């Protein structure tokens, strides 16, 4: 699943029984997510991977991360929140493009 949040952009996938990879293109995004959720996880960097940075965690950690995302929801407009968040503002135009592309499905 892809998650775009005020902490960063992530891809979460299941890799084997009970294990998940929380992946990011930018290390700081994982650092933000770990700090916000209070989980303990080692960030691994795999230079040859599609998503360079990741943590490998139990499903229960992903559940805690998802709860943190819900509990820290403090905005009524995602794009504006990204613009106002220094560690994420450089992603604003990209998120705008994603919004526009997905809007075209709604309009079709």
Question: What is each stretch, according to the model?
Answer:
Residues 1-108:
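Structured alpha/beta or helical-core interaction and ligand-binding surfaces enriched in interleaved
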């Amino acid at each position: 699943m892809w998650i775009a949040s005020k902490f960063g952009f992530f891809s979460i996938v299941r890799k084997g029984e009970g294990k998940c990879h929380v992946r990011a293109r930018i290390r700081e995004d994982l650092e933000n997510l770990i700090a916000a959720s209070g989980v303990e996880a080692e960030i691994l960097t795999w230079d040859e991977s599609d998503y360079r940075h990741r943590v490998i965690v139990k499903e229960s950690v992903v559940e805690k991360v998802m709860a943190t995302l819900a509990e820290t929801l403090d905005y009524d407009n995602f794009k504006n929140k990204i613009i106002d968040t220094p560690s994420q503002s450089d992603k604003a135009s990209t998120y705008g493009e994603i919004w526009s592309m997905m809007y075209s499905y709604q309009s079709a």
